């Protein structure tokens, strides 16, 4: 009679894909958006429609496509737009 056992070295990898997609509690000030859609209502309802490999740091509802690289979009709505991600003075805000 013999007994065989496998030992698996499991560890938490903080740089894994899922931890990049989920909000990690970063400061909202670090969140950014290049393309923001807002309604004409007062106050406006705005949503970032950027598609990137990860959502911005303050995103609560991030949806990613199963692709390589992943294509993620944040579905949170706010009464404002985040600052532009890239160092350009042109921030695209589209009012519906």
Swiss-Prot record:
Disulfide linkage: 32-85, 33-48, 36-81, 38-46, 55-62, 59-74, 64-72
Query: Which InterPro entries does the protein's record reference?
Result: Bowman-Birk_prot_inh, Prot_inh_BBI
Q: Which residues form the signal peptide?
A: 1-10
- Please provide, in alphabetical order, the Gene Ontology terms of the cellular component aspect for this entry: extracellular region
Q: Which residues cross the membrane?
A: none
Hey, what tissues is this thing expressed in? Answer: Seed.
> Propeptide positions, renumbered to this chain?
11-24, 88-96
Q: Which UniProt keywords apply?
A: Disulfide bond, Protease inhibitor, Serine protease inhibitor, Signal
Q: Does the keyword Transcription regulation apply?
A: no
Q: Which PANTHER family match?
A: BOWMAN-BIRK TYPE BRAN TRYPSIN INHIBITOR (PTHR33479), BOWMAN-BIRK TYPE PROTEINASE INHIBITOR C-II (PTHR33479:SF19)
User: Main role?
Assistant: Inhibitor of trypsin and of chymotrypsin. May function as a natural phytochemical defense against predators.
| Family, per entry | Belongs to the Bowman-Birk serine protease inhibitor family.
Q: What is this protein called?
A: Seed trypsin/chymotrypsin inhibitor IVA
What organism does the record attribute this protein to?
A: Pisum sativum (Garden pea)
């Amino acid at each position: 009679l013999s007994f065989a056992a496998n030992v698996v070295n499991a560890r938490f990898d903080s740089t894994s894909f899922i931890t990049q997609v989920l909000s990690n509690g970063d400061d909202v000030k670090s969140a950014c958006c290049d393309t923001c859609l807002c309604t004409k209502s007062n106050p406006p309802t705005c949503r970032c429609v950027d598609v990137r490999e990860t959502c911005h740091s303050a995103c609560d509802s991030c949806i990613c496509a199963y692709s390589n690289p992943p294509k993620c979009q944040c579905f949170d709505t706010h009464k404002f737009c985040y600052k532009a991600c890239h160092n350009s003075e042109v921030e695209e805000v589209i009012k519906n």
